[in-house]
Amino acid sequence: MEKVKVVGFTMVKPASPTPSNTIWLSNLDLFATWYHVPAIYFFRPAASIATPSAADLKLSLSRVLVPYYAFAGRFTSSPDGRREIKCTAEGAYFAEAVSELSLDEFGVYTPSVENCRLLVPAHGSNPSDKNEKSTLFFSFS
């Protein structure tokens, strides 16, 4: 088996209707470099708590996208070229992957760049978002 194998892609939409509007990015955001910031978090499950499934996380994400509806939108530009988020409720990108590696084998405290790339969804890896303008990418392994 590969170190990490992607087994599914989904767009997780908000659990209930959200406002349909456009939000300008702040002036600070306009001067920042335009790219997604990868972040990886590892959690060892507590013995008394059941390990969440991908379905559990998708349900939680859909509920969170209601008050934080901009994350279900898409980056775009206004007619005059200003960057903004169009709140479309299209959803957040969710990739599900499996691995036979333990956290220790993966190198949790000192992961290699190669291993990190296996877990972070990259632009172009989302087949349902051809324009690569999603505001939020998730990967569950």
Model-derived regions: residue spans:
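Non-catalytic N-terminal regions of enzymes
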Residues: 1-141
